[in-house]
Amino acid sequence: MATINQLVRTPRVKQVVKSNVPALEACPQKRGVCTRVYTTTPKKPNSALRKVCRVRLTNGFEVTSYIGGEGHNLQEHSVVLIRGGRVKDLPGVRYHTVRGALDCAGVNDRKKGRSKYGVKRPKS
């Protein structure tokens, strides 16, 4: 425990919190342009072809973003909205594309969890 004199001389140092999503710059989402759309494989023990895209953001950052849901319509030069949120089995992927916003269409025939995949309520 520090004495009051010691604290007067040098105050306590605040711990600096490092952001998990630095490219968003404290914004909820950011817009960007796809520079490359491709598939990649997850790390062990999982096996799949995960759909990801490389995105150049409006603030100049270039990040890798995961495309969730079954099927997508993205290609090079598509304008997308990205949000934070990493993919645990893809190293270096710290962002998600927002489905149903800008050029990224929602998931077809999605019935459950629709809000996460940009799907409107079906006509009963």
UniProtKB/Swiss-Prot annotation:
One of its GO terms (biological process) is translation. The modification 3-methylthioaspartic acid is found at D89. CDD domains: Ribosomal_S12 (cd03368). GO terms for cellular component: small ribosomal subunit. Pfam families: Ribosom_S12_S23 (PF00164). It comes from the Bacteria. GO terms for molecular function: rRNA binding; structural constituent of ribosome; tRNA binding. Keywords: Methylation, Ribonucleoprotein, Ribosomal protein, RNA-binding, rRNA-binding, tRNA-binding. The keyword Electron transport does not apply. Disulfide bonds: none annotated. InterPro entries: NA-bd_OB-fold, Ribosomal_uS12, Ribosomal_uS12_bac. Part of the 30S ribosomal subunit. Contacts proteins S8 and S17. May interact with IF1 in the 30S initiation complex. With S4 and S5 plays an important role in translational accuracy. Interacts with and stabilizes bases of the 16S rRNA that are involved in tRNA selection in the A site and with the mRNA backbone. Located at the interface of the 30S and 50S subunits, it traverses the body of the 30S subunit contacting proteins on the other side and probably holding the rRNA structure together. The combined cluster of proteins S8, S12 and S17 appears to hold together the shoulder and platform of the 30S subunit. Belongs to the universal ribosomal protein uS12 family. HAMAP family: Ribosomal_uS12_B (MF_00403_B). This is Small ribosomal subunit protein uS12. The lineage of its organism: Bacteria, Pseudomonadati, Pseudomonadota, Gammaproteobacteria, Vibrionales.
